[in-house]
Amino acid sequence: GLTFAIKDNMDWAGVPTTAACPGYSWVPQQSAKVVHLLIESGAALVGKTNMDQFACGLNGTRSPHGPVPNAFDERYVSGGSSSGSAYVVATGQVDFSLGTDTAGSGRVPAGLNNIVGLKPSKGLISTRGVLPAAQSVDCVSIFARTVPMACRVLNAAMGYDPQDPYSRAIKLQTQAFPPIFKFGIPKQRLFFGDDL
């Protein structure tokens, strides 16, 4: 089976959830819904990852456990707040990992570590058992080294959860690109402040 890690704001039954704040630490009795689904699908959860405390930060340096380095050069930031989740995938420690994305916390570290970061449509993956940052927009994000792997994880992780008030039954659809690509050019190309 595939190996994976989760950001430390997600519950794993019997393992402390700290959100990178030792004073907050508590031990959940059940795993987050998405974690449960992935384990049931045969993936092996191997650990939790460091993060910007309470998912507040986009650089990966705001943790009492220390900063998470960039996977290519430790002189640079990894991006955050799902910094550890991006790092363990980029360095090949796991096949995929889970993070969260409210305002870039999944996409930023994915980009800075040159991996795939998938932020699904809100409600596609349950956030039950995930410590909220801004519950109306929080999403569980997926980190992988390839798009096919991220899609494989998404297929196992998604699904309606009646115990998550933001969960939605969404049917995934694809559409072929049109035969002719069209794009727009604004009539007014000079914007306020451009002449400064």
Please annotate each region the language model reported.
Residues G1-T102, F183, G193:
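Gly/Ser-rich catalytic/binding loops embedded in alpha/beta enzyme cores
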Residues F4, D8, V116, V140-A144:
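Short glycine- and hydrophobic/aromatic-rich loop-to-beta-strand nucleating segment
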Residues P16, L58, A110, G129, ...:
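Short, flexible helix/strand-to-coil boundary loops that buttress conserved ligand/catalytic motifs
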Residues Q29, K33, S83, T100, ...:
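Conserved active-site and cofactor/substrate-binding residues in soluble primary-metabolism enzymes
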Residues H36, S83, T91-G92, F96, ...:
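Residues on a specific face of well-ordered alpha-helices
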Residues G60, T102-R128:
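Glycine/threonine-rich beta-strand-loop-alpha-helix active-site module
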Residues K119-L196:
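A short helix-breaking turn/cap at a secondary-structure junction
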